[in-house]
């Protein structure tokens, strides 16, 4: 795409650079030169990179998460209620059954996801 740049009445076409022009060989080499030292350090010190051997770092908050998002928590009930209300309103506005089915599918995914993570 060409644009026109005018300075005091004179005009010269200026070609707009493409997004892909940033992915040159020199820029890729600069990126690799920045990423390789970090990757090597992560390989040499995996205990720092992944907290290996430290046990479960999030175990302390497990009870809090289960109390907040567990099966009998009020947040789950409010989320399901919000899904039903939004689905009903969207159906009434558009008269499209896909919204009702979509929110039912989202409810199933949320229930399955919570059972997978153990809530």
UniProtKB/Swiss-Prot annotation:
Periplasmic compartment spans: 1-73
Asked if the record carries the keyword Membrane, the reply is: yes
Q: Which residues lie on this side of the membrane: Cytoplasmic?
A: 95-98
Alphabetical GO CC annotations of the entry are:
extracellular region; plasma membrane
Q: Which UniProt keywords apply?
A: Acetylation, Cell inner membrane, Cell membrane, Conjugation, Membrane, Plasmid, Secreted, Transmembrane, Transmembrane helix
Q: Name where it's found.
A: Cell inner membrane; Secreted
Record propeptide residues: 1-51
The way it spans or sits in the membrane comes to: Multi-pass membrane protein
Q: Where, per the database record, does this protein carry N-acetylalanine?
A: 52
The record's annotation in Pfam families points to:
TraA (PF05513)
Which superkingdom?
A: Bacteria
Please give the start and end residues of each transmembrane region: 74-94, 99-119
InterPro entries assigned to the protein according to its UniProt record, in alphabetical order: TraA
Q: Which family does it belong to?
A: Belongs to the TraA family.
What functional role does this protein have?
Propilin is the precursor of the pilus subunit, pilin, that forms conjugative pili, the filamentous surface appendages required for cell-to-cell contact during the earlier stages of bacterial conjugation, and that retract after contact is established. Mature pilin is assembled with the help of TraQ and TraX.
Report quaternary structure and partners. Answer: Monomer. Interacts with itself to form filaments; also interacts with TraQ.
The protein here is known as: Pilin
Q: Which organism is it from?
A: Escherichia coli
């Amino acid at each position: 795409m060409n644009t026109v740049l005018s300075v005091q009445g004179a005009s010269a076409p200026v070609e707009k650079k493409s997004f892909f022009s940033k992915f040159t060989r020199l820029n890729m080499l600069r990126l690799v030169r920045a990423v390789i030292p970090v990757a090597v350090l992560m390989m040499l010190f995996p205990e720092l990179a992944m907290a290996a051997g430290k046990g479960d770092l999030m175990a302390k908050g497990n009870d809090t998460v289960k109390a907040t998002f567990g099966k009998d928590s009020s947040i789950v009930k409010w989320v399901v209620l919000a899904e039903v209300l939004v689905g009903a309103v969207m159906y009434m506005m558009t008269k499209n059954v896909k919204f009702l089915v979509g929110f039912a599918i989202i409810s199933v995914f949320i229930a399955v996801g919570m059972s997978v993570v153990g809530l």
